[in-house]
Amino acid sequence: TETVIPEDIYVLTINPHMHLIGKKYKAYAVEPNGDTIPLIKIDDWNFRWQYFYTFKKILHLPAGSLIKVEATFDNTLNNMDNPFNPPQFITGENGSMKTTDEMLQLIVSYLPYQEGDENLKLE
């Protein structure tokens, strides 16, 4: 999935979010000039890693950048975290947010960009 950033922003934190069927998670930005900026990559998803991750330096994304999220899910018996045996069709119907439902989200904390912000350190 992807979304376009309509204005210059600086990113403070990101929060990847999936449930028990999630296996891999990757988020990155593509600037209007085509440059790719990695945001987060988790090759072995763990449900307990749903934290807000803070960048050491403010990340500037210019207007028109795309934020893209890619994920892999494993709804088989090979997934030791699968809550269902046998596996079932999983949704998040009607806004249900149970751990046994599934979802894919990227929460981004950001503020409008001001020149010089990229020199601030968040550590």
Question: Where are each of the predicted segments found?
Answer:
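His-enriched metal-coordination microenvironments in redox/metal-binding proteins
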Residues: 1-119, 123
